[in-house]
Amino acid sequence: MKGSNRNKDHSAEGEGVGKRPKRKCLQWHPLLAKKLLDFSEEEEEEDEEEDIDKVQLLGADGLEQDVGETEDDESPEQRARRPMNAFLLFCKRHRSLVRQEHPRLDNRGATKILADWWAVLDPKEKQKYTDMAKEYKDAFMKANPGYKWCPTTNKPVKSPTPTVNPRKKLWAFPSDSSRDLPSPKKAKTEEMPQLNFGMADPTQMGGLSMLLLAGEHALGTPEVSSGTCRPDVSESPELRQKSPLFQFAEISSSTSHSDASTKQCQTSALFQFAEISSNTSQLGGAEPVKRCGKSALFQLAEMCLASEGMKMEESKLIKAKESDGGRIKELEKGKEEKEIKMEKTDETRLQKEAEFEKSAKENLRDSKELRNFEALQIDDIMAIKMEDPKEIRKEELEEDHKCSHFPDFSYSASSKIIISDVPSRKDHMCHPHGIMIIEDPAALNKPEKLKKKKKKSKMDRHGNDKSTPKKTCKKRQSSESDIESVIYTIEAVAKGDWGIEKLGDTPRKKVRTSSSGKGSILDAKPPKKKVKSREKKMSKEKSSDTTKESRPPDFISISASKNISGETPEGIKAEPLTPMEDALPPSLSGQAKPEDSDCHRKIETCGSRKSERSCKGALYKTLVSEGMLTSLRANVDRGKRSSGKGNSSDHEGCWNEESWTFSQSGTSGSKKFKKTKPKEDCLLGSAKLDEEFEKKFNSLPQYSPVTFDRKCVPVPRKKKKTGNVSSEPTKTSKGPFQSQKKNLFHKIVSKYKHKKEKPNVPEKGSGDKWSNKQLFLDAIHPTEAIFSEDRNTMEPVHKVKNIPSIFNTPEPTTTQEPLVGSQKRKARKTKITHLVRTADGRVSPAGGTLDDKPKEQLQRSLPKATETDCNDKCSHNTEVGETRSSTPEMPAVSAFFSLAALAEVAAMENVHRGQRSTPLTHDGQPKEMPQAPVLISCADQ
């Protein structure tokens, strides 16, 4: 196998010629899997084979041609393709067959099937491929004596630096004005952590992700970030470097904001918003200075406050300085009001705000340059507002609506909170957006205190500035319109923070939501969320992955927001927060969840490429082998089918074998199926790989992956009644498989009856009494007798009653289990008395019949008429027992098609059934579940 493994490596290399990026991943397998033989080979080869997919349709001649071609091309090491390993040869040989069977499968799905199949191959069959691979490798090495196996491992190391360089450019680009110094510093600071943490990829995601990444890295390197940002007071760099929570911690810890501008540089825009909202009018002129360095959102809040002050003084048409003075006045007024409220709630907050005022004043003094910028902004805004305050307001309101659509979602929680706080405000349409932006960050960053401050500030705003909402929106618009004109941090922040905000409001939504709840923890996650949110937009597969990954953050944010809302009630309108904030995660999760619901379903059932890779376990293999996880497209089609057929049909058609194999044993089950084919392939095998390939190509269609998936299931069942029984109980446990459940009903219910009727009826000797079953049923369970009589006609009724029995079509496969009269008696007795034995050796009573049953499976629908008697009790008992299982299981199935949920439900149901009625164990579900896979695989072998 070493040779084959080496061949794998070579083949991976040879096949990876055009796909360098994958090969670096592929190399991990040979390096990590150090020749663990079959299983490691399978997975390694799967990955490598994915690279090879294009090559693998070449055919037997293609292999040798590849050798020649690779030899020609391989003279340069990097261009040389690794010689195909045994598995790759196998895949190349059989991929077309899998394709024929599963036209909708993507290469990955086909490779998974091939890998499962390969795992099931007999060593003899594999030996042919390994020999061929050795020959291939020898020829390859002769052709390329200097060939090295891992030339590409160094490449990934190189890639991070170029990625970091663009990031420097990205940082420097927005920071052209005042950030040129901090941005390179920042880039360096982030580069260091990126190299350490491998954050290079998100750099390409855009400024927002970079911001969050910077925040995350700032957590690791806050000192460096603070040092870098403070020189220029351009605070966005530090904002980016420090997570909003960390910045918040800094601010709260160092409430003496004498360095407020620098500290606020560190403070995230959200915290700054919190400050603004808490000090809404108060921070007025003082905060503009702080805001200069603050994120664009904070600047927007600043502008909103300025607009408030200007609005207050609009009649006077105050100038920028006047607006600052007005802001200071407003600060004092608002602060007095807030101090009253703050004293009620938290004197410490009053102190903080007082410190904020002091720091704001100090900042006004310290950061006159920033003020100049702000004055420019204010002048611009003032000019705009002075020109046409009403018209501009309207325009800005419209713009706000446009621009705030994102903010709506991103800040829906805070916006709703604000709305609930400000229902009386005039420009409701605009408020949510402007206010959302201003206060949402606060709600998310300081979540508790900030939200309290927010609400207080909202209250203050209600009292002081009812006109502010319009201007918040208005200012926000003006800030957008002035982004270019307003060069101070908005430009840097706008490009990094703000421009992306438009693009990445959704990312920010999630980031903020997450940051609100989990703070620093989520701070690490938010970048992922941003990336993921973008990925969601990019593709459903990514969205499915992102949904999985991003949903936890969403839920976290939800729980966090709930916690926050729960905490906010302390002295504030926590109620608006609670519903609104809860509403925010819904909106976020809602946005994600539309896709997520579809993607989630797909993910759970099939999984996107990434999810599949992560799911590469036995379960996934079994699912793929059974055709369950063929591909996203197949999943979509399956979803459509399931929607048409109904969940039960979906489960039945798609899940029959999968469900039981899944619950029984993902890996062994799938391999079982594949082994069936491989055996036949072994029969086909010829001395030469070419002949083997040809024969296997010819023979594979016979054992096509479908057969491999579906027929193999019957074969294991044939070999093992127990396996079938266990699989069927699993199916029944999943409830949607009505036909399966009927069959399971037959066996399980017969067993079930055995146990139940032992208590219920003298049918403890039901083995003999099965012939008299109807009599007993009539006497004991007239309804069952009715079912038995009517079952031919009543099967639909049973389907109704046995909700899972919707599908008869799956029955052919599942009907295998019900045995005829004496066979059933024997099977039940053996299963009841010898659960393990049935799995091991006594499968013959059940298993031998089952061997005949694969054929009978198709006929099972007919035997059902005869078996209806048994089925009657079975159906009745199954109705009793399986309705139990189906009621729990069906909801799980209907609610989520996630394989994990179904597996858990099935497992739990099997356990419960085993507890409820060992008859289920007759099938050996619980006991055989583990054994069945092993036995099945052995039987197949």
From Swiss-Prot:
Biased composition (Low complexity): 661-670
Keyword Transcription regulation found: yes
Region feature Disordered, mapped onto this chain: 1-21, 39-80, 157-200, 221-242, 438-482, 499-600, 635-677, 714-771, 803-888, 912-941
Phosphoserine PTM sites in chain numbering: S243, S478, S485, S704, S822, S844
Domain of life from the UniProt record: Eukaryota
Biased composition (Basic and acidic residues): 1-18, 177-191, 499-508, 536-552, 758-771, 866-882
GO molecular function: DNA-binding transcription factor activity, RNA polymerase II-specific; RNA polymerase II transcription regulatory region sequence-specific DNA binding; sequence-specific double-stranded DNA binding
GO BP term, pick one: bone development
Sequence ranges of Polar residues compositional bias: 723-742, 805-817
Residue stretches of biased makeup (Acidic residues): 39-52, 63-75
Biased composition (Basic residues): 449-459, 743-757, 823-834
Membrane-spanning ranges: none
Keywords, sorted A to Z: Coiled coil, DNA-binding, Isopeptide bond, Nucleus, Phosphoprotein, Transcription, Transcription regulation, Ubl conjugation
Compartments, as annotated in UniProt: Nucleus
GO CC field: chromatin; nucleus
SMART domains, alphabetized: HMG
UniProt entry tagged with the keyword Metal-binding: no
InterPro entries for this protein: BBX_HMG-box, CC-Dev_Transcription_Reg, HMG_box_dom, HMG_box_dom_sf, TF_HMG_box_BBX_DUF2028
Known DNA-binding region: 80-148
Cross-link (Glycyl lysine isopeptide (Lys-Gly) (interchain with G-Cter in SUMO2)): K385, K573, K696
Coiled coil: 326-370
Role noted for this protein: Transcription factor that is necessary for cell cycle progression from G1 to S phase.
Protein name: HMG box transcription factor BBX
Species of provenance: Homo sapiens
